[in-house]
Amino acid sequence: MLFDFIYYNPTRIHFGKDSLSELKGELTSYGETVLLIYGKNSIKKIGLYDEIVKILNEGGKKVIELSGVMSNPTYSKVLEGGKLVRENNVDLILAVGGGSVIDCAKAISVSAYCEGDAFTRYWINFEPVNNKIVPVGSVLTMVGTGSEMNGGSVITNEELKLKNGRVYPSEVYPKFSILNPEYTFSVPQYQMVSGIFDIMSHLMEQYFSGNDNNTTDYVIEGLLRSVIDNARVAIKNPNDYEARSNIMWSATLALNTMAGLAKEQDWEVHMIEHQLGAYTDCAHGMGLAAISIPYYNYIYTYGLDKFVRFAKEVWHVSPEGKTKDEIAKEGLVALESFIKECGMVTSLRDLGATKEMLPLIANSTVLGGGYKKLTAEDILTILEACY
């Protein structure tokens, strides 16, 4: 049965090869000062930095820069950005990069004018944001997180060894996002396949809940098949525009709240990976890939019918002459085979985790779960199976 819901998403998407030309028009809605936030030098290498700075200058904008945003953005970088916002009375934060850069931009937008410690108030206590929020826009260069069209912001507090996520209300969503698949061509393959599994994990976290024939489940199955098919093409030819554009749009649809409408959701794989990332700083998608198979093997019997459906509808497993348990297991074997086919990581050891870290990760993970509510002991068992 579908839950009651209201659907609203305020982000305006400009998609395609010429989408950057729309930035000039978007800038007219905001004041003079723009905080340009990005990672390292990749946007400079592909010429995107120069294009954006030119558009900003032609629009009469005063540009303040914050560079060096890393994968798994840190609270210290958020504080650095907030200081720039206050000192320069920033009117718009323009994030150019992948999900980490956009997450950091959103974090700066809500915390710049926060009284007290924003991480404690907003990422631990989940207090409502009652201070000024600085608008955010984005130019996407790496796909996976869906941050370009949602209110999510995952931030790592280095001092606390805590990586927490928060989904903020629509006021924090990017006002606009520019998506040109060509900007993803230069992303290294390791990061590309990491992003691909991040997309799949977002979809599976929303899929593995309940056993009804929810319309949203059909949407998720279609998106999963699209990602799988196009990933195989993109891995062989990273410059295949059709494959990269389908992956990019699937990533956005996977986490713009549409794929979770009217459903219970899980997200425990992400909760475990967040703490893995806090201790190892590993690539998010690779951490998800390493955790997913042991996690699903641990809980699939509690949601057997949905795992059977997953096997049949996503992986085309034939049910003929097989028990439900056999079908479900075959679907998980197919998922694991795809993970290996794409060159994704399957061991926590390969991500820099030590045996001594596992209890620390388990005991600091936010407890939850969809089909089975987990304890810290359950999570430790899963982590040991991943190691």
Each PLM stretch: what is its role?
Residues M1-L92, L348:
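ATP/NTP phosphate-donor binding region
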Residues T11, S21, C114-D212, R309:
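A glycine/threonine-rich phosphate-anchoring loop and its flanking beta-alpha core
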Residues V69-P73, S100, S111-A112, T141-G144, ...:
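Acidic, glycine-rich active-site loops and adjacent beta-strand->loop/helix elements
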Residues E80-G82, V101-E115, M149-G152:
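Short Gly/Thr/Asp-enriched flexible loops that form oxyanion-binding sites at enzyme active sites
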Residues V90-K106, T141-S147, Y279-C282:
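Glycine/serine-rich anion-binding loops at beta->alpha junctions
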Residues E171, V314, S318-Y387:
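C-terminal charged capping/lid subdomain of soluble metabolic enzymes
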Residues Q206-K329, V333:
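Active-site segments that bind and position negatively charged phosphate/pyrophosphate groups
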